[in-house]
């Protein structure tokens, strides 16, 4: 789905059949890229609320992999003055079910999904979060595999017989089948689609013509999609793809195209890579050239929106009257946003009987569990997005630069490549460019010991030996247990900086803080180029640094290669926020950083 809100399109007959179906209708909608899926979902919700009389927040649930889908749906519903439904990622809704059962969501997201599935299987009655549902909308069902597939199928069994389903997907964009290799469950996307039609009574529908493609080459991609869907032989499909790519504009190596990616105001560009390693290389090159960009994260790594700390942080809690929350929101947001944000907070909290108050403790638990609905997470605001092809699903851009992979697994089958390339090609509205990276003297590979990627260079002294030059900076490498401060700058000043910072994608440096470092691990302050402190590295970063660079006689005073992805709200111990002079609610801001952390060995 698009992450923008273009003018409302006129629905064709196929789309109208989906939109105007009764609330108890169950449909499996085959929705190709650019066929107006966002508009159909928005109009479907509008019809369910306005024509069928459903209550958006209680009786409609939308489950999606994509924040872009949620942003688009929310924006377009606001324009039409239609209340937004409960919209979550599959992982977030699993955490909500666990919290509702008094189980603290712990461990990996895969573990939470399995625990929530077990909870549903063992339940003697429908959980409160499901019991009131009268319609469920499932987005990108072609990517439901393994544990998440089992979770959704188990959830659907608890729906009332007269509850409807609108499931949307496109088998040609199914690119997550590889996850089955490491999954305990072997339920495939094909199994999900068969269950939807055979077990849950979904009828199959389509959406008709393409509405996304505007440029000449993107329109050729639309035609390719039709040919691929009519092809059953993988090698034949690959030949069709290669014939099209021969006509694609070629921009050469990154030195020839890096300065072309920044679009004019109001437009968006994507640089799409096959592997995480290539994403890290592209991001570092753009970082070195001071090209502002954001690296697309997995859905689980989108934290709470920054305005939450700004609004709720000063409030004492644990329960606040609506009037006090709205007054706090008015100090931060435009007047017409206040009602919307209150409703989103209240919907997330789930205490509908206490309609005139907000439980800050409940909001805190949701943030800690990373179980907030997607409208309350911090969006990607950069006009240039660097992403793997897989994480770009559901997004659309004006221009797309597709980077040829520097590595592919041996024995990759034809359909895997075709589906991946089709997803990349079909993200563009106006222009598509093929480009590449040069041959590098270093290699980037996953390190299981570190739990992250690292960059290795060949040793000049020992033939065949390598040494680590940099390692990936992860989501958890920023300290979140307390508000950051330094001997020179207090926590309140850093919070003010984070609250006003609007330069997402800027370069960030890590500077050694000797006063907070120990013999076991270093601590680095995260600062902008003009020396504004943003945060501090975590114990996890210090441990990874020590494992990787502990051999150095002296610790480097500067680490570069980093950029700011977003500023987000975290929830922690109220005593920490009180100690920092930020109130007793336990909410504060942290930066989210990405890149290849590269110690400057000249500063050791």
Annotate each PLM feature:
Residues 250-267:
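Conserved interdomain hinge at the start of the Helicase C-terminal
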Residues 447-604:
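Conserved active-site motif detector
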Residues 56-59, 161-163, 170-171, 199-204, ...:
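Short glycine-/polar-rich loops that comprise or flank the Walker A/P-loop
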Residues 9-33, 86, 95, 100-185, ...:
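Conserved helicase NTPase motor core
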């Amino acid at each position: 789905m698009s992450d923008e809100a273009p003018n409302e399109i006129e629905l064709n007959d196929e789309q109208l059949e989906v939109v105007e179906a009764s609330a108890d209708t169950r449909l499996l909608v085959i929705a190709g890229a650019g066929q107006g899926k966002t508009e159909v979902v928005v109009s479907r919700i509008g019809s369910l609320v306005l024509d069928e009389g459903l209550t958006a927040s209680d009786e409609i649930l939308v489950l999606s992999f994509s924040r872009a889908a949620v942003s688009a749906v929310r924006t377009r519903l606001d324009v039409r003055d239609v209340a937004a439904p409960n919209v979550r990622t599959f992982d977030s809704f699993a955490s909500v079910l666990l919290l509702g059962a008094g189980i603290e969501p712990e461990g990996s997201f895969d573990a939470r999904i399995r625990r929530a599935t077990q909870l549903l299987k063992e339940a003697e009655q429908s959980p409160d979060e499901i019991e009131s549902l009268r319609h469920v909308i499932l987005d990108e069902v072609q990517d439901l595999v393994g544990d998440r597939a089992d979770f959704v199928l188990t959830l659907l069994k608890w729906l009332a017989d007269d509850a409807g389903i609108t499931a949307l997907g496109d088998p040609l964009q199914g690119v997550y089948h590889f996850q089955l290799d490491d999954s305990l469950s072997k339920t495939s996307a094909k199994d999900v689609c068969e269950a939807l039609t055979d077990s849950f009574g979904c009828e199959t529908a389509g959406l008709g013509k393409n509405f996304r493609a505007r440029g000449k080459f993107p329109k050729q991609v639309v035609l390719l999609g039709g040919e691929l869907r009519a092809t059953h032989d993988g090698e034949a499909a690959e030949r069709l793809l290669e014939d099209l790519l021969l006509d694609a504009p070629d921009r050469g190596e990154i030195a020839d195209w890096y300065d072309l990616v920044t679009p004019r105001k109001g437009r968006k560009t994507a640089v799409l890579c096959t592997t995480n390693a290539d994403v890290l290389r592209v991001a570092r090159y753009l970082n070195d050239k001071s090209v502002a960009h954001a690296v697309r994260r997995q859905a689980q790594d989108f934290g709470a929106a920054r305005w939450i700390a700004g609004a709720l942080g000063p409030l004492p809690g644990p329960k606040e009257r609506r009037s006090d929350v709205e007054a706090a929101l008015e100090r931060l947001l435009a007047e017409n946003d206040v009602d919307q944000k209150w409703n989103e907070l209240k919907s997330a909290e789930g205490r509908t009987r206490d309609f005139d108050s907000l439980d800050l403790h409940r909001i805190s638990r949701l943030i800690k569990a990373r179980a907030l609905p997607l409208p309350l997470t911090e969006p990607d605001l950069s006009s240039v997005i660097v992403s793997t092809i897989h994480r770009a699903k559901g997004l659309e851009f004006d221009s797309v630069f597709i980077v040829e992979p520097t590595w592919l697994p041996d024995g990759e089958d034809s359909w895997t490549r075709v589906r991946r390339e089709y997803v990349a090609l079909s993200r563009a509205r106006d222009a598509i460019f093929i480009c590449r990276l040069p041959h590098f003297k270093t290699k980037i590979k996953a390190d299981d010991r570190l739990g992250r990627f690292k960059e290795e260079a060949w040793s000049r002294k020992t033939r065949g030996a390598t040494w680590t030059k940099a390692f990936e900076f992860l989501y958890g490498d920023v300290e979140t247990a307390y508000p950051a401060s330094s001997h020179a700058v207090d926590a309140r000043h850093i919070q003010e900086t984070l609250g006003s910072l609007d330069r997402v994608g800027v370069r960030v440096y890590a500077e050694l803080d000797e006063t907070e470092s120990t013999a076991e691990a270093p601590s680095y302050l995260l600062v902008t180029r003009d020396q504004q402190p943003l945060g501090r590295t975590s114990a996890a970063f210090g441990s990874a640094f020590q494992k990787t660079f502990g051999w150095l006689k002296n610790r480097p005073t500067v680490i570069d290669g980093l950029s700011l992805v977003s500023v987000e709200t975290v929830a922690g111990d109220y005593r920490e926020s009180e100690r920092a002079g930020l109130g007793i609610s336990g909410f504060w801001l942290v930066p989210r950083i990405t890149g290849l952390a590269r110690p400057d060995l000249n500063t050791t």
